[in-house]
């Protein structure tokens, strides 16, 4: 996770607020073939897909390097603080900061 966070910091700079591991790897109940779920918390952005694609090649490289699928989502800082969507609640409950 340290390598992943450092790479994302190079891509997003000051926009990157945090990186969280969640899902089966965070809970410790992953199995062979489980993906690694990651939430990338960004200060702000206008276009989700533009920001997503900024890091997609890097995430793919990490997936290939470690032979594991990294599934990631981006969340705005304001969403993290104010929204009550199931995915946000789940990450708050079980997420591990990188």
Language model features with spans:
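Short beta-strand->loop micro-motif that forms the acidic, two-metal-ion catalytic signature
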Residues: 37-41
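Catalytic core of pol beta-like nucleotidyltransferases
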Residues: 1-17, 27-32, 43-98
